[in-house]
């Protein structure tokens, strides 16, 4: 009998703390890495984490270089034209962070004439292009952290990202010194999606069912909460 190859789980090669980033030894660590390990164990799937450049991660999936994506990828109608998704495994708000005391608000009127930083090829870029592009300049970055660095240095006025990534930045020395959250943007499910799920090739229904069952298991048996506790003060599973 042929031995089944391990499933290659694609994560973004660009660090995205606290979800996935390399430690000093080059090992990938973070909440999403822990969840990958737990979901694969729950589904009795042998998995290997495979870093891929974010902009090429969907082509890597459809081209067969990886078997699944677990990289904080939001379930959106646009992406579902190309790939399929499991049930969601987290859903957090999209938030804007600015310099302390900026007086800005997380809407088009509040962003008028400002420069907003977003990570390229994300729902945050899509949202900013749809809702803020008439009022503000949108600047894209390869990583969320690069945008945060420019914000801290005063080169941009605001950065839009997932609330968890922003919380991690605001807990850092640089974030504490410079910046504050001005709150969540108005929801737009067409752009922001229905939460984050496992990206899969279309037609792989058996693998999708395996992931859905494994996600349900870690949610039900307390593993999800145990993994989350060291990283987050409240559940990020969402509505």
Outline where the language-model segments fall:
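Short helices/loops that flank or line small-molecule/ion binding pockets
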Residues: 37-42, 50-51, 55-67, 82-84, ...
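Ligand-binding clefts/hinges and TM-proximal coupling segments of bilobed small-molecule sensing domains
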Residues: 46, 123-139, 180-181, 212-239
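Extended ligand-binding regions for polar small-molecule ligands
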Residues: 33-42, 102, 110, 115, ...
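A conserved helix-loop-strand patch within extracytoplasmic ligand-binding domains
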Residues: 45-48, 73-74, 87-133
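Ligand-binding cleft/hinge of the Venus flytrap
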Residues: 19-24, 36-45, 124-142, 148, ...
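Extracytoplasmic small-molecule ligand-binding "clamshell" domains
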Residues: 4-72, 81, 221, 230, ...
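Periplasmic-binding protein-like
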Residues: 13-14, 91-98, 171-212, 232-239
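A ligand-binding cleft/hinge motif common to bilobed small-molecule-binding domains
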Residues: 56-59, 73-81, 127-130, 157-192
